[in-house]
Amino acid sequence: MGSATVLDSIIEGVRADVAAREAAVSMDEVKEQAKRAPAPLDVMAALRASGIAVIAEVKRASPSRGALASIADPAELARAYEDGGARIISVLTEQRRFNGSLDDLDAVRAAVSIPVLRKDFIVRPYQIHEARAHGADMLLLIVAALEQPVLESLLERTESLGMTALVEVHTEEEADRALQAGASVIGVNARDLKTLEVDRDCFARIAPGLPSNVIRVAESGVRGTADLLAYAGAGADAVLVGEGLVTSGDPRSAVADLVTAGAHPSCPKPAR
């Protein structure tokens, strides 16, 4: 084994935090909370609607940049995103590197009527029931963080609760694993979570090899409409944008600009 990667150290912290939460709220309790939660919203309908879907992210910090934005009211930010035309709101709940929390997820879920994505490093079944209990309609599964049998069982559990998994990949080999697991939504992250380096050409390399029935999401590296159009040209159905929105000064307008570009007749349409 080589030296520990950034991803390894994040997951080590996540495992400790999950164990602490499970000690406070048992798996049985969190399963009961999940059963009582309102039914999940239709994520696939949001992603398949015409135009490029914008998934707008509530993101306070990142391992690569540190603190990004002081978000006093995540609910207000989420409403601004929804008003701007975002189809889905992504909420970071990892606390050590991204300064997120389940409180942020609760606040956003209560504030908007569109689907909400729990963005975290999901490594245990507990976190899936926890996501549902806190109102998530969608959650992130990162192929690089999971052995294949674990990926497959977590994906199956996510779907059994009526949620949709955004299965994240960074290489062609990971994309093959995502497909083998049965992913219906695949996100290509331009950022390598092991090194934090960004490779904007990553999506254009991987997306053409994905079957036409798979929804393709471009993650990381969207700084404005030019990046959205480039990703659309490479086959994106959706873009996930965080840093570019929380640092924009006017998140509603920043989302609206992306949505308008993604709906424009000149915007490339994915081949289906």
Swiss-Prot record:
Its EC number is 4.1.1.48. Coiled coil: none annotated. It holds the Pfam family IGPS. Keywords: Amino-acid biosynthesis, Aromatic amino acid biosynthesis, Decarboxylase, Lyase, Tryptophan biosynthesis. The keyword Membrane does not apply. Pathway: Amino-acid biosynthesis; L-tryptophan biosynthesis; L-tryptophan from chorismate: step 4/5. It catalyses: 1-(2-carboxyphenylamino)-1-deoxy-D-ribulose 5-phosphate + H(+) = (1S,2R)-1-C-(indol-3-yl)glycerol 3-phosphate + CO2 + H2O. This is Indole-3-glycerol phosphate synthase. It comes from Mycolicibacterium vanbaalenii (strain DSM 7251 / JCM 13017 / BCRC 16820 / KCTC 9966 / NRRL B-24157 / PYR-1) (Mycobacterium vanbaalenii). The gene is trpC.
